[in-house]
C-alpha cells in the first residue's frame, strides 16, 4: 500500500510540475527543466518552495500561512499553478510521501496536511481538484480526509461525476460502524454541494447509495439526519 501511494504521489507531483508551464523559449527550441522554471519565478515563491521542503512542521506552517494570506488578498495571479504545486506537496507530506529514519517516520504532519488541503480547495484549478481526490483516497487521518471532501464540495468541479465517484468510493471502503462523525458529515456536505451545483441536481446512483449508508451508519443523529435531508433534496 505504501509503495502504491508513493508511486501515485510521485506521478501527481510530476503532473503538477508539468502544469507550471514548461514550454520552449521562443526561438531556442530548448525545453526548460523544472528547476529552470522555478528560477524564473519570484524570489518569494522560490523561498516558499524551499520552506515547504523543510523538515519541520513550523516552517511548513509558516509557508501555509503566507499562502493563506495571498489567497485572502486575491494576489495569486499568474502564480496560481506554482502555489498549487507547493500546496499539493504539503497536502501529501507524510501520507502519500513517507520519509523514514530507520523504522521511524519523520514527516508525519497531519495538521500541515489538513491546512494545505483546505487551501487547495481555494486555489480552484483542475490540478488542485485532482490533488484533493488523491488526498481523500490516500490519507489515513480522518480530519484530513474530511477536509478534502469538504474542499471538493466547495470547489464544485464534477465533470462526468468524477468527484462524486471518488466520494462514493471513499464511503464504500469505510467501516461505517466505526468511522468518524466529522468525516461522515463532510462527505454528506460534499454531496449536497455537488447536487446544488449540478444543473437538474446530481444524477449519480452511487451518491444516493453512499448517503443511504451514512444515514444507516453508527454516527451521531445530526449526521444521519443530514444524510436523509440531502437525499430528500435530491428527490426534488
What spans do the regions from the language model cover?
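Boundary at the C-terminal end of the N-terminal hydrophobic targeting segment
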Residues: 19-24, 29
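Amphipathic alpha-helical scaffolding segments comprising HEAT/armadillo-like alpha-solenoid repeats
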Residues: 31-51, 73-102, 125-137, 158-174, ...
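Short coil/turn segments at helix-helix junctions and helix-capping linkers
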Residues: 139-140, 217-221
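Bacterial N-terminal signal peptides that target proteins for export
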Residues: 1-9
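Short, solvent-exposed mixed-charge patches
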Residues: 23, 235-236
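Structural detector for internal amphipathic alpha-helices that build alpha-solenoid repeat scaffolds
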Residues: 28-38, 53, 57-77, 103-106, ...
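Bacterial N-terminal signal peptides
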Residues: 9-18
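Extended hydrophobic secondary-structure segments
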Residues: 136, 144-145
Amino acid at each position: 500500500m505504501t509503495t502504491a501511494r508513493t508511486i501515485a504521489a510521485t506521478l501527481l507531483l510530476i503532473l503538477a510540475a508539468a502544469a507550471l508551464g514548461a514550454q520552449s523559449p521562443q526561438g531556442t527550441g530548448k525545453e526548460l527543466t523544472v528547476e529552470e522554471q522555478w528560477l524564473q519565478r519570484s524570489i518569494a515563491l522560490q523561498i516558499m518552495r524551499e520552506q515547504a521542503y523543510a523538515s519541520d512542521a513550523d516552517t511548513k506552517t509558516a509557508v501555509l500561512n503566507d499562502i493563506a494570506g495571498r489567497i485572502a488578498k486575491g494576489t495569486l495571479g499568474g502564480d496560481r499553478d506554482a502555489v498549487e504545486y507547493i500546496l499539493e506537496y504539503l497536502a501529501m507530506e507524510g501520507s502519500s510521501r513517507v520519509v523514514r529514519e530507520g523504522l521511524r517516520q519523520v514527516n508525519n504532519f497531519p495538521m500541515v496536511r489538513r491546512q494545505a488541503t483546505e487551501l487547495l480547495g481555494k486555489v480552484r484549478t483542475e490540478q488542485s481538484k485532482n490533488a484533493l481526490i488523491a488526498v481523500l483516497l490516500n490519507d489515513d487521518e480522518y480530519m484530513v480526509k474530511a477536509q478534502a471532501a469538504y474542499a471538493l464540495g466547495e470547489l464544485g468541479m464534477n465533470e462526468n461525476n468524477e468527484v462524486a465517484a471518488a466520494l462514493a468510493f471513499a464511503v464504500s471502503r469505510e467501516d461505517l460502524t466505526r468511522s468518524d462523525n466529522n468525516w461522515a458529515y463532510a462527505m454528506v456536505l460534499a454531496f449536497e454541494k455537488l447536487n446544488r451545483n449540478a444543473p437538474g441536481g446530481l444524477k449519480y446512483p452511487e451518491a444516493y447509495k453512499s448517503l443511504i449508508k451514512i444515514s444507516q451508519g453508527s454516527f451521531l443523529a445530526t449526521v444521519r439526519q443530514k444524510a436523509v435531508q440531502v437525499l430528500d433534496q435530491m428527490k426534488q
